[in-house]
Amino acid sequence: MTQDYRVLLYYQYVPIEDGESFAQKHLSDCKALGLKGRILVADEGINGTVSGTVEQTNAYMSLMKNDSRFTSTIFKIDEAKQNAFKKMHVRYRPELVNLSLEDDVNPLELTGAYLDPKEFREAMLDENTVVIDARNDYEFDLGHFRGAIRPEIRSFRELPQWIRDNKEQFMEKRVLTYCTGGIRCEKFSGWLVREGFKDVGQLHGGIATYGKDPEVQGDLWDGQMYVFDSRIAVPINQKEHVIVGRDWFDGSPCERYINCGNPECNRQMLASKENEAKYLGACSHECRVHPDNRYIKAHQLSNQEVQERLALLEKDLAS
């Protein structure tokens, strides 16, 4: 008999006094329930993804709802074949979302207008609307809303500077923004309002909610949604599946993520199993020949085998 598992994604902006002590106690509670996952706690709130059996996840939601600070917390629930995490971590951080701002934004005081999935879809179709993806580049590359702008950033904290450098092209437009579950957009949309953007909207509940809406059914989403657990990719569009990801090495359609074999690089890239083997699991020649290449170690390749593959690769690239 197979065990049914679930993955819970949630966040709540709410003041938490002595966040460090709360994080320690919350870790004990999660372990007692048998959960696995990753939770961030800050003085400004909580953000987590946890997985476990139906019984365990139900118990966790009850635990949270019994705390007056989290009675309004919305849990996005995904069915899963197995645990999405190997361990349970609860960590304290100074803030849940880092935009590297001198004067941080409090979403409880300033944030963009909330749009439900149907409203967001309708707004995307307006020609006077621009849609800005508030996630990292590797998340966008796996999947995104059709026509969305891809900021040239490697991390969320680089987004404000990118907006400042490019704001002239959409300052007078209606600006919509979205992210995985909604937490990043709460701050980012508030910052856009503070920067002087007149009409700012955010996808309430994020992509995760959009994909489950029975009417919208993930329409206008291409690719898959990147998630920060062992699943990596989650389907969103229930009407059609358009692959937008491209293999790092040959540009062919691909939705399989790997990390560069060089632990000092660790770049996330899309690659087929064939290309991962051909290129020794590394994004560049420098990373392929790195002495700690994890792909070479994991597959126990001898030095002779490595040299033979490198020679074949050099010949192929030269042709």
From Swiss-Prot:
Domain Rhodanese: 125-219
GO BP: tRNA modification
Keywords: Oxidoreductase, tRNA processing
InterPro entries tied to this protein: Rhodanese-like_dom, Rhodanese-like_dom_sf, Rhodanese_C, TrhO, TRHO_N
Keyword tRNA processing: yes
EC number of this enzyme: 1.14.-.-
Any one GO molecular-function label of the UniProt entry: oxidoreductase activity, acting on paired donors, with incorporation or reduction of molecular oxygen
tRNA processing among keywords: yes
Name of one Pfam family that matches: Rhodanese_C
Catalytic activities: uridine(34) in tRNA + AH2 + O2 = 5-hydroxyuridine(34) in tRNA + A + H2O
Catalytic machinery residues: 179
PANTHER family given in the database record: RHODANESE-LIKE DOMAIN-CONTAINING PROTEIN 7-RELATED, THIOSULFATE SULFURTRANSFERASE/RHODANESE-LIKE DOMAIN-CONTAINING PROTEIN 2
Function: Catalyzes oxygen-dependent 5-hydroxyuridine (ho5U) modification at position 34 in tRNAs.
Protein name: tRNA uridine(34) hydroxylase
Native source species: Lactococcus lactis subsp. cremoris (strain MG1363)
Gene that specifies this protein: trhO
